[in-house]
């Protein structure tokens, strides 16, 4: 995938970039793998706002993705590589020899016509899914399970990857994209390769309207609000926030404040914490 740049014909186009979608082979999704997706606008079942900055945006249909990769021993062939509006990564449609069709996350380098397989006996090649115990040390993987059979939960965004570092008893050491080294049960599955569409992070949205197309509403600074709306609000003119540290709209310390629980059950599985940003 390459980044497409635009001539500065307007203020919105100046600096704007987008994907050239060269890897996409069709714009017609598989209808049997679509599900309705209703917009919530950031509201819960009481109609109360629980997630800010959500609302509007283009209509979408959900693509049912096979994160479990549990179709063992049955080869499948890549039919198409498609755009998915619900995630940063592209997806690939797999036609299995028994007639079933499934979507998977499209790894970097996966081409139409490539044969893939899942299971302990699968080869170590891009797109194949195996238990971590069967993956050699040093292999780059993605779509990693945390519980056997639950489906991949880690390393699913565009361009991300993890690396198998070693094996200790019933656990496998994996270095995640954040730099965190974590112990994961060896029975958990992972897919070989790096997630594709790796230049997604380089895209410059360019204008506010493009964010609105994606369903993202504006973010207002607390310092320009009234004191009853935000701890940073009020004052004459451009006043400082008047606090020892920045606060969230609900009065909690933010911007660097540690929010992870002091006694988290998963601490025993973390060998090295993630790198500081």
Swiss-Prot record:
GO terms for biological process: cytoplasmic translation. It holds the Pfam family Ribosomal_L2. Gene3D superfamilies: 2.30.30.30, Nucleic acid-binding proteins, Ribosomal protein L2, domain 3. Keywords: Ribonucleoprotein, Ribosomal protein, RNA-binding, rRNA-binding. PROSITE patterns: RIBOSOMAL_L2. Residues 1-23, 36-58, 219-277 are annotated as: Disordered. Residues 258-277 have a biased composition (Basic residues). Residues 8-20 have a biased composition (Polar residues). GO terms for cellular component: large ribosomal subunit. GO terms for molecular function: rRNA binding; structural constituent of ribosome; transferase activity. HAMAP family: Ribosomal_uL2_B. One of the primary rRNA binding proteins. Required for association of the 30S and 50S subunits to form the 70S ribosome, for tRNA binding and peptide bond formation. It has been suggested to have peptidyltransferase activity; this is somewhat controversial. Makes several contacts with the 16S rRNA in the 70S ribosome. Belongs to the universal ribosomal protein uL2 family. PANTHER family: LARGE RIBOSOMAL SUBUNIT PROTEIN UL2M, RIBOSOMAL PROTEIN L2. Part of the 50S ribosomal subunit. Forms a bridge to the 30S subunit in the 70S ribosome. This is Large ribosomal subunit protein uL2. It comes from Bacillus licheniformis (strain ATCC 14580 / DSM 13 / JCM 2505 / CCUG 7422 / NBRC 12200 / NCIMB 9375 / NCTC 10341 / NRRL NRS-1264 / Gibson 46). The gene is rplB.
């Amino acid at each position: 995938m390459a980044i497409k740049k635009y001539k500065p014909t307007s203020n919105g186009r100046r600096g704007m970039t987008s994907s050239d979608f060269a890897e996409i082979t069709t714009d017609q999704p598989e209808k049997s793998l679509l599900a309705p997706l209703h917009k919530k606008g950031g509201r819960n079942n009481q109609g109360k706002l629980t997630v800010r900055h959500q609302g509007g945006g283009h209509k979408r249909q959900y693509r049912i993705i096979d994160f479990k990769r549990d179709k063992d021993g049955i080869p499948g062939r890549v039919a198409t590589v498609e755009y998915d509006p619900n995630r940063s990564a592209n997806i690939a449609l797999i036609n299995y020899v028994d007639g079933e069709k499934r979507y998977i996350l499209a790894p970097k380098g996966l081409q139409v016509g490539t044969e893939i397989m899942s299971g302990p006996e699968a080869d170590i090649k891009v797109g194949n899914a195996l238990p971590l115990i069967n993956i050699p040390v040093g292999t780059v993987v993605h779509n990693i399970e945390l519980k056997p059979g639950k489906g991949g939960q880690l390393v699913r965004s565009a361009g991300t990857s993890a690396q198998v570092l070693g094996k200790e008893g019933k656990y496998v050491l994996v270095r995640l994209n954040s730099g965190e080294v974590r112990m994961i049960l060896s029975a958990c599955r992972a897919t070989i390769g790096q997630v594709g569409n790796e230049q997604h992070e380089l895209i410059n949205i360019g204008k506010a309207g493009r964010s609105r197309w994606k369903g993202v509403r504006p973010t207002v600074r607390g310092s320009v609000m009234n004191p009853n709306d935000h701890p940073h609000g009020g004052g004459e003119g451009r006043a400082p926030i008047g606090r020892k540290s920045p606060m969230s709209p609900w009065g909690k310390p933010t911007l660097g404040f540690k929010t992870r629980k002091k006694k988290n059950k998963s601490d025993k599985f973390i060998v090295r914490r993630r790198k500081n940003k």
